[in-house]
Amino acid sequence: MIYWQNRILTNVKNALGSKCPNVSSTVNNTKAKFPACAVRIVSDSAISDDLESLDEEAAVLCGVAVDIYSKTSLGHAIELMDIANKSMYAMGFKRQEGPMQIEDESSPELYHLTSRYVRVIGSEDIIEKLTFEAP
Protein backbone atom coordinates (compact mmCIF):
# COMPACT_ATOMS: atom_id res chain seq x y z
CA MET A 1 0.00 0.00 0.00
CA ILE A 2 1.31 3.43 -0.98
CA TYR A 3 0.54 5.97 1.75
CA TRP A 4 2.19 9.33 2.37
CA GLN A 5 -0.16 11.03 4.90
CA ASN A 6 2.53 11.76 7.50
CA ARG A 7 5.02 13.35 5.09
CA ILE A 8 2.33 15.46 3.42
CA LEU A 9 1.05 16.64 6.82
CA THR A 10 4.57 17.41 8.06
CA ASN A 11 5.45 19.41 4.95
CA VAL A 12 2.28 21.54 5.16
CA LYS A 13 2.79 22.03 8.92
CA ASN A 14 6.40 23.13 8.40
CA ALA A 15 5.37 25.51 5.60
CA LEU A 16 2.73 27.20 7.77
CA GLY A 17 5.13 27.37 10.72
CA SER A 18 4.22 29.81 13.47
CA LYS A 19 1.50 31.44 11.35
CA CYS A 20 -0.68 28.37 11.94
CA PRO A 21 0.74 26.06 14.62
CA ASN A 22 -2.46 23.99 14.90
CA VAL A 23 -2.13 21.59 11.93
CA SER A 24 -3.56 18.07 12.10
CA SER A 25 -4.87 15.24 9.97
CA THR A 26 -8.24 15.11 11.69
CA VAL A 27 -11.35 17.22 11.92
CA ASN A 28 -13.22 16.72 15.16
CA ASN A 29 -15.59 18.50 17.50
CA THR A 30 -13.07 19.34 20.20
CA LYS A 31 -12.49 23.01 20.90
CA ALA A 32 -9.82 24.04 18.41
CA LYS A 33 -7.26 26.80 18.69
CA PHE A 34 -7.34 29.15 15.72
CA PRO A 35 -5.99 29.50 13.16
CA ALA A 36 -6.11 25.81 12.31
CA CYS A 37 -5.41 23.59 9.31
CA ALA A 38 -6.59 20.06 8.55
CA VAL A 39 -4.72 17.99 5.93
CA ARG A 40 -6.53 14.75 5.04
CA ILE A 41 -6.15 12.00 2.47
CA VAL A 42 -9.63 11.86 0.90
CA SER A 43 -8.92 9.30 -1.81
CA ASP A 44 -6.10 6.89 -2.43
CA SER A 45 -7.22 4.65 -5.27
CA ALA A 46 -4.92 2.20 -7.01
CA ILE A 47 -4.52 3.08 -10.68
CA SER A 48 -1.85 0.55 -11.61
CA ASP A 49 -0.83 -2.84 -10.27
CA ASP A 50 2.65 -4.31 -10.12
CA LEU A 51 2.90 -6.81 -13.00
CA GLU A 52 5.51 -8.91 -11.19
CA SER A 53 3.55 -9.13 -7.95
CA LEU A 54 -0.20 -9.02 -8.46
CA ASP A 55 -0.87 -8.22 -4.81
CA GLU A 56 1.01 -4.88 -4.85
CA GLU A 57 0.11 -1.43 -6.10
CA ALA A 58 2.39 0.22 -8.62
CA ALA A 59 0.72 3.64 -8.38
CA VAL A 60 -2.13 5.42 -6.62
CA LEU A 61 -4.10 8.54 -7.42
CA CYS A 62 -3.81 10.40 -4.12
CA GLY A 63 -6.41 13.05 -3.27
CA VAL A 64 -5.73 15.45 -0.41
CA ALA A 65 -8.09 17.97 1.18
CA VAL A 66 -6.63 21.03 2.90
CA ASP A 67 -8.96 23.01 5.16
CA ILE A 68 -7.97 26.34 6.72
CA TYR A 69 -9.88 27.87 9.64
CA SER A 70 -9.38 31.44 10.88
CA LYS A 71 -11.27 33.73 13.23
CA THR A 72 -9.26 36.77 12.11
CA SER A 73 -10.53 37.45 8.58
CA LEU A 74 -11.13 35.91 5.20
CA GLY A 75 -7.90 37.57 4.03
CA HIS A 76 -5.99 35.79 6.79
CA ALA A 77 -7.49 32.43 5.77
CA ILE A 78 -6.53 33.14 2.13
CA GLU A 79 -2.95 34.00 3.19
CA LEU A 80 -2.63 30.68 5.05
CA MET A 81 -4.19 28.74 2.16
CA ASP A 82 -1.66 30.32 -0.22
CA ILE A 83 1.20 28.99 1.93
CA ALA A 84 -0.38 25.52 2.10
CA ASN A 85 -1.01 25.63 -1.67
CA LYS A 86 2.66 26.37 -2.38
CA SER A 87 3.75 23.43 -0.21
CA MET A 88 1.32 21.09 -1.99
CA TYR A 89 2.65 22.21 -5.39
CA ALA A 90 6.23 21.73 -4.13
CA MET A 91 5.32 18.07 -3.46
CA GLY A 92 4.00 17.63 -7.01
CA PHE A 93 0.28 17.96 -6.26
CA LYS A 94 -2.05 19.98 -8.48
CA ARG A 95 -5.09 21.80 -7.17
CA GLN A 96 -8.24 20.11 -8.44
CA GLU A 97 -10.70 22.53 -6.83
CA GLY A 98 -10.74 25.49 -4.50
CA PRO A 99 -10.04 27.38 -2.55
CA MET A 100 -13.73 27.53 -1.76
CA GLN A 101 -15.20 29.34 1.21
CA ILE A 102 -17.39 27.14 3.39
CA GLU A 103 -19.97 29.12 5.34
CA ASP A 104 -21.28 27.70 8.60
CA GLU A 105 -24.35 29.49 9.93
CA SER A 106 -23.66 28.18 13.43
CA SER A 107 -20.18 29.83 13.44
CA PRO A 108 -20.42 33.03 11.36
CA GLU A 109 -17.22 34.37 12.97
CA LEU A 110 -15.21 31.46 11.52
CA TYR A 111 -13.60 31.77 8.07
CA HIS A 112 -13.19 28.33 6.48
CA LEU A 113 -11.52 27.63 3.14
CA THR A 114 -11.09 24.23 1.51
CA SER A 115 -9.01 23.05 -1.45
CA ARG A 116 -8.49 19.61 -2.98
CA TYR A 117 -5.31 18.37 -4.61
CA VAL A 118 -4.37 15.29 -6.63
CA ARG A 119 -1.17 13.55 -7.61
CA VAL A 120 -0.16 10.17 -8.99
CA ILE A 121 2.27 8.54 -6.57
CA GLY A 122 4.23 5.52 -7.78
CA SER A 123 5.52 2.77 -5.51
CA GLU A 124 9.08 3.98 -6.09
CA ASP A 125 8.28 7.69 -5.65
CA ILE A 126 9.58 9.60 -2.68
CA ILE A 127 7.98 12.76 -1.35
CA GLU A 128 10.93 14.68 0.03
CA LYS A 129 10.84 16.42 3.37
CA LEU A 130 10.61 20.08 2.43
CA THR A 131 12.38 22.88 4.25
CA PHE A 132 10.89 26.33 4.49
CA GLU A 133 12.05 29.73 5.62
CA ALA A 134 10.21 30.90 8.71
CA PRO A 135 7.13 32.83 7.55
Task: Describe these PLM feature segments.
Residues M1-S53:
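Small/polar-rich, solvent-exposed N-terminal microdomains that initiate assembly or binding
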Residues A65-Y89:
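Mid-chain, well-packed structural core segment of small domains
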